[in-house]
Amino acid sequence: MNLSNIIALNDYPQTPYQEETVINTLKFRWIHAQCYQFILPNGKCLLTDPFFPQEEKAWVRENTPFLDIEDLGKIDYITINHSHFDHVQSLPKIFKHSSPIVICDRIFARELSAAYGIQEFNIFPFVQGQQYHFEDFYLETYIGKHGNLKMVCDLNGNEFKDEYNPAIGKLNSYGSLFNTNFLFRLLTNFTIGFAAGVKLDNLKESWKYGGGPNLLLRQRMRKETPKEFAEECESIGGQLVLPMHHDACCKENEDMNLFCKNVNEIFISHQTPMRMFNPERLKWYTINLNISIEGE
């Protein structure tokens, strides 16, 4: 190398400096219950726990906006946390327009296929506690636990009986026994944590050394206070927090904007580098990674 050819950097070049650069990491919207729709960086679409607000047993008010099924677009992947009706009932509506991979626990995969007429070829049955590689993300599965409904297992499926479709009752009977949480690692290395139900010890243990996911979806229990929710999220770890299953409320926490504000105040008071965001139903949002110049 001829060192005489090296010149110093020109700090004031003719080409102006950039003031900002942005990478769109993820698009998402909340639909109902634990149903979120994600558009991944490569354009593929992931849907969690398909249950739309127009379903017969949905917790809705007179002014609750319903989803336009035509607006869903092509769904590539569906994940199912557990098999209660409010996590799977909208599957037939999706299969009228798409042919997604349905990722669910192998324990109830047969009943899911039978109850909703899903071809076995479309179902990817997993074993809890394992890792899986899909074309568009890596998936880690964690054993979860449903909240206590104080019920015993109904072998005949009478608790959720459907006179026109007997398989639905039996499918629902698995719902409180088999519950799975997830970590999605996108091809960009962005991570989405899905934490529903109770008894999250194995999930917390797995995530504690990595600081938790970039985006945490955490179930807001029906009677949960902002303090309880904030402290549970802190124990899980993560950066951005989105609520799920907050369609079911009690009078004290029906204002989710106030709930979110109170949770963030607790995060700030605890000096926790975590923030909660309450998405408006059906509205699209974008998570960006960006660099921007500080104001002078």
Describe the residue ranges of each PLM region.
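Active-site environment of divalent metal-dependent phosphoester hydrolases
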Residues: 54-55, 83-89, 109-112, 130-132, ...
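Short hydrophobic/aromatic beta-strand or adjacent loop that forms the aromatic wall/cage
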Residues: 33-35, 129, 177-181
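Active-site-proximal loop/helix segments of hydrolase catalytic cores
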Residues: 167-236
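Binuclear metal-ion centers of metallo-dependent hydrolases, dominated by the metallo-beta-lactamase
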Residues: 101, 114-134, 229-296
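Pre-active-site segment of Zn-dependent metallo-hydrolases
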Residues: 12-20, 37-80, 89-96, 148-173, ...
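Active-site HxH/HxHxD metal-binding segment of metal-dependent hydrolases
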Residues: 65-133, 137-152
